[in-house]
Curated annotation (Swiss-Prot):
Specific inhibitor of cysteine proteinases. Probably involved in the regulation of endogenous processes and in defense against pests and pathogens. One of its GO terms (biological process) is defense response. This is Cysteine proteinase inhibitor 8. The lineage of its organism: Eukaryota, Viridiplantae, Streptophyta, Embryophyta, Tracheophyta. The record marks 33 as: Reactive site.
Length: 123
């Protein structure tokens, strides 16, 4: 008879632990697979990623875009990190526009890929 309350207590403890895993990540770092805002876009690494993305795009498209700065962004934890960066860039005539660059980076393998680069309006 004492087994039933013990089993119920165990079941309740397991359920509470599972619920904490599902909803307990609020405010405790990025959720794996979910996008979270980059709080400090002025961070030198974020600015360097934005510059690299514009340079990579310009080398592939020959449109002459020049990096100005990262204005906002999000990050996504995957097997490495995806960065969705809103960058300000200017064309050869000096006109400035915003673009959305998605960069995949895996620091332990020195991997960096530009997976997307579009005008911000198309984002």
């Amino acid at each position: 008879m004492a087994r039933i309350p013990l089993l119920l207590a165990l079941l309740l403890a397991v359920s509470a632990a599972a619920a904490a895993q599902v909803g307990g990540n609020r405010g405790h770092g990025p959720l794996v697979g979910g996008w979270s805002p980059i709080t400090d876009v002025g961070d030198p690494h974020i600015q360097e990623l934005g510059g690299w993305a514009v340079e990579r795009h310009a080398s592939l498209s020959s449109d002459g875009l020049r990096f100005r700065r990262v204005t906002s962004g999000e990050q996504q934890v995957v097997s490495g990190m995806n960065y969705r960066l809103v960058v300000s860039a200017s064309d050869p005539a000096g006109a400035t526009a915003s673009y959305v660059a998605v960069v995949y980076e895996q620091s332990w393998t020195n991997t960096r890929q530009l997976t997307s680069f579009k005008p911000a309006a198309a984002h």
